[in-house]
């Protein structure tokens, strides 16, 4: 963990996986801006400098709290296209990439404006969207240094992206893979951002930019129409919560997997988790087994507008206690479970007045669908691939429906006031990483920097491994590997601080309002205090 990735004892802070993005947010905080304003500045730069994980062709999920501890969630999730069913064959999986996966609209830009409206109304925010995205426009137009992460994901997908002509034109200039630190320009994306700055966020959905987007998407066979874009709106909803020791954990509700994170922590709570030590085989085993119980119930989560199911019942105390009792301290549960893909970015900010925002922004898979919408420079997400084509599945495709969502930024309150902001990249890995981080922070008293630097794992299939193994970073130690194997875990050692283990960030607020925080050493990011 480098000094550049950590920050200590400040009144305000921003964290993200990109140093340039964090610097944009920190400038807003120095100028007296709110946490939401700082996050919008940070998020817009990430849409330029971290295009492999997020962009304005994707979605965003927010958790916000004022300094009194009033927590809300903003679901910036695009809905299924009205004519999307015309491209689906029942029983045949939706394509993971390409036009067939572009079945949902994109809500990131609307979420920025929605959050800014909240900031202006409730937090005294004065900054507008146009000024906040100006740094992003400048970087897209004038160029920025390509990150190691972007180069890694270009190289990792080089065989796939060779089949994405419009994508290749944008991201492999002159037909070659760029190298780390090379200056990269996104002129078409700059023009799209300029339109948003000039005409407002709704130009993306109802104006000239919407026309360009639909023209580009329809040219490759996407069913998304301008009418679909016009219906896309961010929703303010109540967060779900769980008491854990002396804090209350908050997460976004269905259709996100925020409930999976809370279920995991609820099972750990019922197990009396403080009886085991940090970093031991017991620690890893019990967290893994709690995650398995949560994931076995997670697949019923879907858009609450399309079901009468009360998903908060998943947090029933008796059920969590029963799951905890079912866990053997010496034997691992077999694990055949489908993997959900996804890559995203976590960013968060706390301002000098105590207001907080914890956000995940994503195009679903790394590089989304691989489809660039015409000459807009916008990579469209492939979130439509999260739907099922089985009409009896809770997450079956339906026009206007929100897909099951892996994004679940978190927040913890202590004494009724914001105490932790946290989140991670990693699809199925999100609840897993968060459970390890939260136990390290809350049960074992580690600092944000130390909690992030410690070894982590990823359970089940991944984009690079079709086996249902437990991938554990090698620095967990030989004794831990041996003990876990003896309990029946099928293990695969992965490198220290592996990309498979996600990129997380944490901001911690003490009772006097001072903050410390860090971004993951597995990322290119930085926490900046003000």
Predicted regions and their residues:
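Internal maturation/activation junctions in enzymes
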Residues: 270-363, 375-376, 383
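Active-site rim segments in enzyme catalytic domains, especially the processed small/beta chain
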Residues: 48-65, 70-73, 223-225, 355-420, ...
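Glycine-rich phosphate/pyrophosphate-binding beta-alpha loops
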Residues: 250-258, 344-348, 360-372, 423-431
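Short beta-strand scaffold segments in enzyme catalytic cores
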Residues: 54-66, 345-349, 409-411, 501-509, ...
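Short, well-structured alpha-helical segments that form the helix of a local strand-helix-strand
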Residues: 36-43, 129-141, 212-214, 278-295, ...
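Noncatalytic scaffold domains of N-terminal-nucleophile
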Residues: 1-27, 33-200, 204-206, 211-256, ...
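Extended C-terminal subregions enriched in glycine
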Residues: 353, 401, 434, 443-498
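Short, small/polar residue-rich loop motifs at catalytic or cofactor-binding pockets
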Residues: 236, 341-344, 405-407
């Amino acid at each position: 963990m480098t000094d550049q990735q950590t920050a200590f004892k400040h009144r305000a802070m921003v964290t993200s996986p990109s140093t340039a993005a964090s610097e944009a947010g920190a400038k807003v905080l120095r100028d007296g801006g709110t946490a939401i304003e700082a996050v919008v500045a940070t998020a817009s730069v990430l849409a330029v400098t971290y295009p492999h994980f997020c962009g304005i062709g994707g979605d965003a999920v927010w958790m916000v709290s004022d300094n009194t501890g009033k927590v809300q969630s903003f679901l910036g999730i695009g809905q299924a296209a009205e004519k999307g069913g015309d491209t689906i064959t029942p029983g045949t999986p939706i394509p993971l990439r390409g036009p067939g996966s572009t079945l949902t609209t994109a809500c990131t830009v609307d979420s920025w404006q929605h959050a800014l409206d909240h900031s202006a109304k409730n937090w005294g925010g004065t900054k507008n969207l146009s000024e906040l995205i100006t740094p992003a426009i400048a970087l897209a137009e004038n160029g920025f240094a390509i990150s190691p992460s972007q180069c890694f994901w270009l190289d990792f997908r080089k065989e796939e992206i060779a089949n994405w002509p419009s994508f290749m034109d944008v991201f492999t200039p002159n037909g070659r893979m760029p190298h780390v630190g090379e200056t990269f320009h996104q002129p078409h994306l700059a023009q799209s951002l300029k339109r948003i700055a000039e005409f407002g966020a709704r130009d993306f959905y109802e104006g000239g930019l919407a026309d360009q987007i639909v023209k580009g998407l329809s040219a490759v066979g996407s069913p998304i129409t301008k009418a679909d874009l016009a219906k896309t709106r961010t929703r303010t909803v109540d967060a779900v919560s769980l008491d854990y020791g002396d804090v209350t954990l908050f997460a976004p509700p269905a259709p996100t997997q925020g409930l999976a994170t809370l279920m995991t922590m609820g099972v750990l709570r019922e197990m009396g988790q403080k009886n085991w030590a940090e970093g031991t085989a017991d620690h890893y085993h019990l967290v893994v087994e709690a995650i398995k119980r949560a994931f076995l119930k997670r697949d019923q989560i879907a858009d609450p507008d399309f079901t009468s199911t009360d998903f908060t019942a998943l947090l029933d105390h008796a059920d969590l206690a029963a799951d905890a009792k079912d866990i053997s301290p010496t034997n691992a549960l077999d694990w055949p479970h489908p993997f959900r893909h996804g890559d995203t970015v976590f960013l968060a900010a706390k301002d000098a007045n105590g207001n907080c925002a914890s956000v995940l922004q994503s195009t679903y898979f790394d590089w989304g669908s691989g489809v660039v919408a015409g000459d807009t420079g916008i990579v469209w997400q492939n979130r439509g691939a999260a739907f099922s084509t089985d009409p009896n599945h809770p997450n079956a495709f339906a026009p206007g429906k929100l897909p099951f969502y892996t994004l679940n930024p978190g927040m913890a309150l202590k004494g009724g006031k914001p105490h932790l902001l946290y989140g991670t990249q990693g699809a199925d890995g999100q609840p897993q990483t968060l459970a390890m981080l939260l136990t390290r922070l809350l049960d074992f008293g580690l600092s944000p920097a130390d909690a992030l630097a410690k070894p982590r794992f990823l359970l089940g299939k991944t984009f690079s491994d079709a086996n249902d193994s437990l991938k554990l970073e090698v620095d967990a130690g030989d004794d831990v590997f041996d003990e876990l194997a003896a309990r029946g875990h099928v293990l695969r050692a992965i490198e220290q601080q592996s990309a498979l283990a996600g990129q997380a960030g944490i901001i911690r607020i003490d009772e006097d309002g001072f903050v410390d925080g860090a971004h993951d050493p597995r990322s290119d990011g930085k926490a900046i205090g003000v």
